[in-house]
Amino acid sequence: LLSEEPHQQIQNWYRDLLHLYKKNPALYELDNDPAGFEWINKDDIFRSIFSFVRHSKGKKKNLLFVCNFTPVAREDYRVGVPTKRQCKLVLNSDEKEYGGSGEKRKEIYKPVKKECDGQKYSFAYPLPAYGVAVFEY
């Protein structure tokens, strides 16, 4: 099966997702503690987009997930964040190697003091159709 490009692309995605899991304590340290998870937006039902944060102990290294479950890309999707620290894009399902469009995106996003999703800070991100973006802060 891996000789077919779509299967290879899915394997690439899972390989990198597993790598992200292994190197980020936010994905396993507080699995059984409510402090390890925070909804950012679970109510965007009309656009079928949700976002959440996985926290590490002491909230030193956190991961923000933004997931789009529709075939509609959102060019300047504003996502709320609980920090003004810069957010680094560490995994993007829209990369060519995962079967995405391969459209280039910035690596660093700097939140501004603009309330969104019940958070004091936010930034705009070009969220791809059926896309998942993971940011580290």
Residues of each region from the PLM?
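Carbohydrate-interacting/catalytic domains
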Residues: 1-137
